[in-house]
């Protein structure tokens, strides 16, 4: 497989702290290898700042990271050219929350029915929600809703846990939510409209079979890193917006603070909720099939 070409530039020392803080907010793991000021790593990209001021970005997510974050928000210069705009009407689907111990699973779909609607998504610089700060998500979500037809399924923990007990498999549950949204959004007849989704299972067959049970005639495209498609990216923003607002709802309802992710800090917080609120409340704010849940229960027995 041909790897993307690394991006190399020069970074002013005055921006070192700003970049590091922004990467930390995005969940990058920070380290300090020899001869560097720091290095930030995510699942798709590494960003290394050397003592000389040279900055090197590598990994399969390089272009998106540079085009939508590094250049506009840090460097304030532009060298990477936009890819050719795909203006075909289509449905994009994505989810948020599947890796978070606390909170819901949110799946969102966006149907961009016209060239104008897709051009508008490009104009407001829609990109993968993981490259956007949480503070910017709500306003972008409002813009997307004004431009496209949208659908969101939010499974709060109580409902999520019941469905997981039925499906016994996260990918099967994801396939059901994705297929339901595609069926709801697809025009009838489908015509030339197709659907695009991230390939979240090892086999494309998992989602394809779920879609075929509901809608036999729509073309389905599954890709790794599908969020690079502007309509899927729009769906990722809607899903993230639903996740963030739902977390606030749970925090208010149960008077607890809920951290995102599944880190050691999250585990410690779960222990505190179990101690202060009891197991029934913990089960209403978390995904009980996570190993963390059983570790927390075991630590108090």
Swiss-Prot record:
Pfam families, sorted: DUF3378 (PF11858), RNase_HII (PF01351)
GO terms, biological process: DNA replication, removal of RNA primer; mismatch repair
Entry coiled-coil feature ranges: none
Primary subcellular site in the record, as a coarse category: cytoplasm
GO CC, one annotated term: cytoplasm
Cofactor: Mn(2+); Mg(2+)
Subcellular location: Cytoplasm
Catalytic class of the enzyme: hydrolase
PROSITE patterns: RNASE_H_2
MF term (GO), any: RNA binding
Keyword terms, alphabetized: Cytoplasm, Endonuclease, Hydrolase, Magnesium, Metal-binding, Nuclease
Bound cofactor: record note: Manganese or magnesium. Binds 1 divalent metal ion per monomer in the absence of substrate. May bind a second metal ion after substrate binding.
Catalytic function, reaction form: Endonucleolytic cleavage to 5'-phosphomonoester
Residue sites binding a divalent metal cation per the record: 94-95, 198
E.C. number: 3.1.26.4
Superkingdom: Bacteria
All copies of domain RNase H type-2, residue ranges: 88-301
Family, per entry: Belongs to the RNase HII family. RnhC subfamily.
HAMAP family: RNase_HIII (MF_00053)
Job of this protein: Endonuclease that specifically degrades the RNA of RNA-DNA hybrids.
Protein name (database record): Ribonuclease HIII
Taxonomic placement: Bacteria, Pseudomonadati, Chlamydiota, Chlamydiia, Chlamydiales
Gene name per UniProt: rnhC
